[in-house]
Amino acid sequence: MKKNILLLSFLCNFSLLLSAQTNVEKGLQSINRSSAEATINFLASDELQGREAGFHGSRVTSEYIASLLQWMGVSPLADSYFQPFDAYRKERQKKGRLEVHPDSIVKLKQEVHQKLSMRNVLGMIPGKNTKEYVIVGAHFDHLGIDPALDGDQIYNGADDNASGVSAVLQIARAFLASGQQPERNVIFAFWDGEEKGLLGSKYFVQTCPFLSQIKGYLNFDMIGRNNKPQQPKQVVYFYTAAHPVFEDWLKEDIRKYGLQLEPDYRAWENPIGGSDNGSFAKVGIPIIWYHTDEHPDYHQPSDHADRLNWDKVVEITKASFLNMWKMA
């Protein structure tokens, strides 16, 4: 009898503990290392052939991401999870640089030297206010294969940017795990063609019918390495200078939730380039960008998953979920 009473007491206390959790804490608790490892190890595997935009590995990656969104219960932004687009290179253009110009496609086709078909992956959790949007995104493409190299020829891109993709997926799941509908529509964006000139995010911005209703964009690009070995918790936190509250949010959440991060806060007056956040900043949309800086394996075949700081990936994902919770 005493044993049964103790068991009943334990179960009651456990139930009270769960019910005492806030919605945001439920979401935060769902973010974990094993999920990050599963996503990154798959995306950075040799089977995906370096995920070059317009080629087989990138196509498989987009299918994988869409299937996970569907499995989680995240709705497609439109009729499909995919936003297809074509990128063109003119005959005399610089090698590796392509363009997306949906308004001048006929003229481009007359001058085209090469065409690559790409597609973004876009999911959404509807908000209470259906007229406003916030976006969290990361590019999923990388550099593919270079047969001219000796030895390892596959650019696996574990940090760049399988790490960012894992964060966006975990944030989507965290919003669902919270059990609370966001105030604004939250779009989960996975960009194709970033390595060829931010093509996917540029296309989205150029064709978006609700661009003026987007209230903020959070970007991930390379969030898993230690640029400074003596500072394993360091992360660069770029944000739009006109929105100093973005810095206040992160400082508050580090204190409140004990996040193991040491941010290098960088407020930017001018639009920030270098990654997909630039496409949004150029049209006046406030941005946040998490980045752990370049390292010796940047854009090298040696950018492998076994070199990542997994604790940092998880802590940045948690911090950015809290950012998005406030932004939404």
State where each predicted segment sits.
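N-terminal hydrophobic or amphipathic helices/low-complexity stretches enriched
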Residues: 18-76, 125-126
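His/Asp/Glu-rich mid-to-C-terminal helical/loop segments that flank catalytic regions of hydrolases
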Residues: 296-328
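Alpha-helical metal-binding/catalytic segments enriched in His/Glu/Asp
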Residues: 121-123, 136-142, 146-197, 320
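Metal-dependent peptidase/peptidase-like ectodomains
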Residues: 191-292
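Second-shell loop/turn segments in exported
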Residues: 23-30, 46-56, 108-112, 149-161, ...
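A non-catalytic alpha/beta surface segment that caps or lines the substrate-entry region
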Residues: 51-124
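Bacterial Sec-dependent N-terminal signal peptides
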Residues: 1-24
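Acidic/His- and Gly-rich active-site-bordering loop/insert found
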Residues: 43, 69, 111-147
